[in-house]
Amino acid sequence: MDVDSGDGPVVNLLWTGGWDSTFRLLQLILDTRATIQPVYVIDTERLSSLIEMQTMDRIKRGVVERFPRAEGRILPHRFFSIHDIAEDATITESYLRLARRWHLGSQYDWLPRLAKQHGLGALEMSVVADSRPRGGIVQCL
């Protein structure tokens, strides 16, 4: 399979090296002409952060080795610290309103704040079909 050059849109992808976000990365590389801007939030409280960063590096090298034309389509990672994400009362109020109705992880508060703070516009996040959030909440995100 050959990979097209990236003359399509830039997609901001929250990529952790997990299988769900890696699937989306590969889907964008193989099925579209998009350029991927990987985004990763460093949380020093999470012990898996270093492993995830090493995994993403290995995956990216493997993709480029297998599909050399993909190299220019995966931009260098943008890394952000969770501790540097600015507060935003409007976003947090919306999150709390939704969290009263559905069980939501705190990332649904700080990810939109990150996107707004850094002008990321749309920020794609992969969610495994059998994990939360479910049902009506997906339409609210």
Which sequence ranges carry the predicted segments?
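ATP-dependent adenylation/nucleotidyltransferase module used to activate substrates
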Residues: 1-141
